Amino acid sequence: MGAGFNPNAGLGMLFVGLARAAFEETLEYCKQRVQGGKPLVEHQLVQRKLFDMLTKVETARAYARAVMLYNASNPLGLGYYSNASKVYATQVAFEIASDGVQLHGGMGLAKGILIEKLFRDARAGLIEDGANDSLALLAAPTMITSHAY
């Protein structure tokens, strides 16, 4: 592992991609699925849910990108930023995939449906390469003592 490199920063970016895929898959489904005489995407509550999903995706993307740029320009890096990127991005990916399953209705958990696969992968991300709670507990003391937030 080179200076400034932490694999969790890369996982943050990977799971931002998963979250984005779950959002896009859900948006397309909501454009096609008709409920109550109109596409799901035309229902206000669905629009609100899609808005929240995209906001979370873009927030996670911005943070994960900032961590990658920070690590690239600082030879020692800050491991807790990388851990925070992984923790935040995997949590967002899980939430987005879960919302996607919900908006897909009964089809959301059917084998062979992309959103179901994304949901399973997002769930695995919460424990992959260190469970999120463990990574947060590992990083918290350094964050507190360095005051670099």
Model-based region annotation:
Residues 6-13, 17, 79, 83, ...:
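Short, conserved micro-motifs enriched in small and acidic residues
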Residues 92-100:
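Hydrophobic alpha-helical segments of membrane proteins
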Residues 1-58, 125, 147-149:
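Glycine-rich beta->alpha junctions and the first turn(s) of the following alpha-helix
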Residues 22-29, 66, 99, 118-121, ...:
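Generic, well-ordered alpha-helical scaffold segments in large soluble proteins
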Residues 42, 46, 79-87, 108-121:
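Charge-rich, acidic-biased intrinsically disordered regions
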Residues 27, 31-38, 54-88, 101-106:
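C-terminal helix-coil-helix/basic helical segment that borders enzyme active sites and/or dimer interfaces
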Residues 104-149:
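Glycine-rich phosphate/cofactor-binding loops in nucleotide/flavin-utilizing enzymes
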